[in-house]
Amino acid sequence: KLDDVGNPIRANSEKSHRLGLEVDASISLSKQFIVRPNFTLSSNKNIDLELDSEDHETKDIAYSPSVIFGNILIYSPLDNLHVSWLQKFVGKQFMNNIELSAAKLPDYFVTDLNIAYEIKPKSVFDSITITGLANNILDRKYVSNGYMWDVYPYYYPQAGINFLAGLTLKF
């Protein structure tokens, strides 16, 4: 459908369903090692979707991967020092509701490294935490988002390896 000046009208799906399972855990392997796995399995469907007077039957809902999993491995060699290895996998997804092949975002896997050191001074602050984060340490090239303009895909590629530093002051 078009509006009064010829632009496509965006509309909600009339019938859809989302069904999924999310699981996360925190497992202490020892005083120094903790593992925190998580995963999501889901089915996200538009049912009997009709667009531009065409019936597209049952298709995946846009931007809804059916598989996501992650893991955090935390190593604490000292009570106030934590080194975390973070991994995340996101399954394929589509940028539109009709599963157009040009609208497919491929799955991706990224790995980050986080180091946090906490100081507990005796005055002014309850604690000071210094944090360093290296994102995408394997320097993977991936796309996590984008949009479609008609049948043409436009992507938002993500940064390669990048670094962040932080300082948290607690009173």
Predicted regions and their residues:
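C-terminal beta-signal and adjacent terminal beta-strands/loops
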Residues: 92-94, 117-171
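Transmembrane beta-barrel outer-membrane domains
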Residues: 4-6, 14-18, 28, 60-66, ...
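Hydrophobic, lipid-facing positions within transmembrane beta-strands of outer-membrane proteins
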Residues: 19-23, 67-71, 109-115, 161-167
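Flexible, surface-exposed loop regions and adjacent strand-edge segments
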Residues: 2-10, 42, 48-60, 100-105, ...
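Gram-negative outer-membrane beta-barrel transporters
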Residues: 11-97
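Outer-envelope beta-barrel architecture signal
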Residues: 31-33, 67, 79-81, 109-111, ...
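Conserved long hydrophobic alpha-helices within structured protein cores
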Residues: 34-36, 103-115, 134-136
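Short regulatory "switch" loops immediately downstream of catalytic or recognition motifs
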Residues: 45-50, 115-121
